[in-house]
Structures are given as structure tokens and as C-alpha cells.
Amino acid sequence: QIWPNPVAGGPPFLFAERAERDAPFAVLSYGHGDVVRGYAAQWHAGLEPWTMVVDGDRWYGRGTADNKGQHSINLGALQQVLAVRDGQLGYTFKLLLEMGEEVGSPGLREVCEQHRDALQADLFLASDGPRVAAERPTLFLGSRGGVNFDLRIKLRPAGHHSGNWGGL
């Protein structure tokens, strides 16, 4: 389903659900499909933001690291679960994708309030964010949100260490 954005001029939301009869629980996965500008001149030789390039086990393309690659992994995992469980997940799966995350998520709160019942779930999965190391999967609990602020500082006249005792 395509849900219109309740904020005028805001991009739409995509909602999908695979409901299974007598499912003991529901999983809601969230992510975004929008990307930042391509910055074509900043890509390495042989790569560009407009063409997907697969090099061994790496994918290069606009949005592959934020957030489309994560969606590909999650949907591929669901496909594998369905394959080994005779077409059944054993739970209800819901997916909410927004198209305005890179510009502050206009309308996200409102659309979640409007569709509260449809978004009801027992587990929330958001595959977005940093990893401790590339080869080490990392689980963060509660890392969503954004803050905008202006910072004014008054520097001391000399150089100081920026650690715990430096006062910066």
C-alpha cells in the first residue's frame, strides 16, 4: 500500500504486510528508500552513483549502505525462511518504508499515529546504523531520532586536550 504523507508536499510511505493465520506474533521492519545526492565526482574510478556495481561480495551504488542494502538483506532472509519452512514464516511480517528520512522524516509521526493499528507489532526491527566493525554484526537498542541545534562556543586562548580533563 502507498500511504500519502499527511504533511503537505511530503513524500509518501510504503506499507506491506504478510499476515499468517494464527501467527503468534508480528514483526514490524522500518527503513527508508530515499537517498542523499549522488555526488558523482566523489566516486572512485569505475564507480558511479547511478549504476549498481557488484565486485565480489561488495555492492556499490547510491543508497546501498543507507538503507537499500539492509532492505535487500532482510528481504533475502525472509525469502530463505519461506523456502525452508514450506512457504510459511510462522509470524506476521510488516514493512514500513519512508521516503523522507534524509530530510528529517516529515510526516512519520503523523502517519504512525494514523495507522497505529496496522503498525501494531511485537518486535520492531530497524536495520540502519553503524557497526562496530565490518565483519562484526552489531545490535543497537534505541538509536532513532534527530536533533538540530546551533552551537556557539567561546574558546580559551591556548590549546587544551579535548579529553575528559581538557574542559572541551
What is each stretch, according to the model?
Residues V132, L141, N148, H161-L168:
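Acidic-enriched catalytic cores of C-N bond-cleaving enzymes acting on peptides and small amides
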Residues R58-W59, G63-G142:
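Acidic/histidine-rich catalytic neighborhood of metal-dependent amide-processing enzymes
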Residues W59-G61, P157-G163:
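Short small-residue beta-strand/loop micro-motif enriched in glycine and branched aliphatics
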Residues Q1-T64, V84-Y91:
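Acidic/His- and Gly-rich active-site-bordering loop/insert found
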Residues G10, V35-R37, E102-S105, R131-A134, ...:
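Flexible loop/turn segments at secondary-structure boundaries
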Residues F149-L151, L155:
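Mobile "lid/hinge" segments at catalytic clefts and subdomain interfaces of large enzymes
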Residues W43-G46, S143-V147:
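Short, flexible loop/turn motifs enriched in small residues
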